[in-house]
Amino acid sequence: MDEFQRXSNKHXXWQQLFLXPLFFREDLXAIGHDHHLDRSGSSEPTEIFFSHFFSFLTVKRSIRRIRKQNKSISLFGNSDSNKLIEYNKNFSFKSMLEGFTIVLEVSIAMRSKHFIKGMDGWNXLRSIHCIFPFMEDKLPHSNYISDIRVPYSIHPEILVRIFRRWIRDVPSLHLLRLILHEWKNSFSQENLEKXXLITQRGNTRFSLFLWNSYVYECESFLIPLIKRFFNPXSLLYGSFPDGIHXEKKIKDIVIFLLQKISTKKIWLLKDSFIHYVRYGERSLIALKGTHLQVKKCRYHLFHFWQYYFHLWFQPYRICSLELSKTSFSFLGFFLNVKMRPLVVRAKMLDDLFITDLITNELNPIAPIRSILFSLAKEKFCDISGWPISKLSWTSLSDDDILDRFDRIWINLFHYYSGSINQDGLYHIKYILLLSCAKTLACKHKSTIRVVREQLGSELFTNSFSKEREFISSSFSKTRSQRERIWNSEISQRNPLXXFWQKMENKQIEN
């Protein structure tokens, strides 16, 4: 990226306005591929597929086809519905997606680089577990939380309007419009209503780029708008790209909302504070205030998506909860805020005072029953939690079987190391340990006792290794029993927790 930027400093002004010349840069394919590999983010795929058939010569030919085509003919090939659904086999459409996505990634990344450095109060973190210390510090001082599921079914013209603030090249905007409409028409109506923007079908890079751009647009206007109501002095226009247009749009939205409420109600929001955190499509807004203020915030969120993105925001996508009375799920944890009494002794001269101090504490709880259900689905145990052999792994070597069970336990232990119900995790370990022994016994057509005699202590030491747990136990000698250790190396949700979260989201939607 830096090399490409140094080579184009002389023409930076017109390159920011016009993207069409970038389609004909022969070195952009390699630069865009390296740029994609270097990007960090929890939602990025671990394996990058880059077509060996891709070349910018194909993009040039596709552009010529667009110029010469008849309006009644489909843009990227046969309009037959059966062939259109399988658009990933269409060579022209796939090449156009790859080329256009690379151009957008490089161009927008170059323009937004100095804006990202100037963002005040924004923290982009690599590890999921960095969220939980923040929540432990902020949520106990809040009494309400709004759980928001960001809507992802959006019209292509709204996406074009989003990119219009970044792209001034009219031909590129027309090309983007054609691609987005073809992308929309490539899905059946049922899939379009559920997930048209972040679907895993087709070009993953393109859908990921659309999702990140859409979320950035939402947060660019939503967070300052909320700050305007809760703390009018905290809104900084300098942190926005294209600050003039952003300031104008925000003022218009604020003026519209101010007409709906009186000045007395605005006064109630002055002494409140608000915290915002997001992972993927889930956003949390923690608020200290009254129930009336929570209803106001919910009302403004509905109108924000309705008037700015022109889409219907389903009521189930915003769930407001009182932290002291209920718990909520986030990133595979059950979270609640409970009161913790403390006995404080203060000595003043000859007098000794004993008083009770009550503080709030965030309690992250590992969903043991949901993990057991996931293990049963993966055939590690039955529905009652009794360990069974993993028959599909009996063709592997003993070392591979031990290593796979070891990785499953290590990932679970590290992900839920900060939970308060550690005893339930060791119950999960017991199930995995017996399932491993039964799998080896089934492979060698023997019993668990014979396997233990043959492997000896190797089954219980090398597999499910203790050294990672020893790190946690060594810290526990020098810290309070209530403090927790969060692993800063975890960058994505545990697969078992992700499966449980998907099941819960389906229940909420139904």
From Swiss-Prot:
Please report which protein family the annotation says this sequence is part of.
Belongs to the intron maturase 2 family. MatK subfamily.
Molecular function GO terms recorded? RNA binding
Pfam (any one):
Intron_maturas2
User: Under which name does UniProt file this protein?
Assistant: Maturase K
GO CC entries: chloroplast
Q: Which gene encodes it?
A: matK
Major localization class = plastid
Cellular localisation: Plastid, Chloroplast
